[in-house]
Amino acid sequence: MKEFHLHKYPVTSVEGNEYAVSIYNDRHSKGFVKVSLYKKVRGFFRKEKFKCLTREGDFAPSYFEEKWDYDYIQMAINEVINYENSIKEQINHENKQKAAIEKFEAWSGQEV
């Protein structure tokens, strides 16, 4: 199988966030591709670079090409949606945890 590496920037989500998406063939499994998601950031000396938001390399999310009907666009969209949903879940978890901590600290220690 011929090796390939697809890269697209910007990929704009429904939320309006811009990401870079890389899709490349899996070196170890035939018929699978890896999809990595990146965000543009400024590094030292204000130099722009891309920070990986998902795993990359051998640990990147895998997609079976046949199952996805070789639709790399849908794979990229799915990865963006998964990432944004995980961020929403994380924020929701942190808010609930913060409320529970405040409730615990306000508790007098008396049994109910």
Swiss-Prot record:
Highest rank taxon of the organism: Bacteria
Protein name, entry field: SPbeta prophage-derived uncharacterized protein YoqB
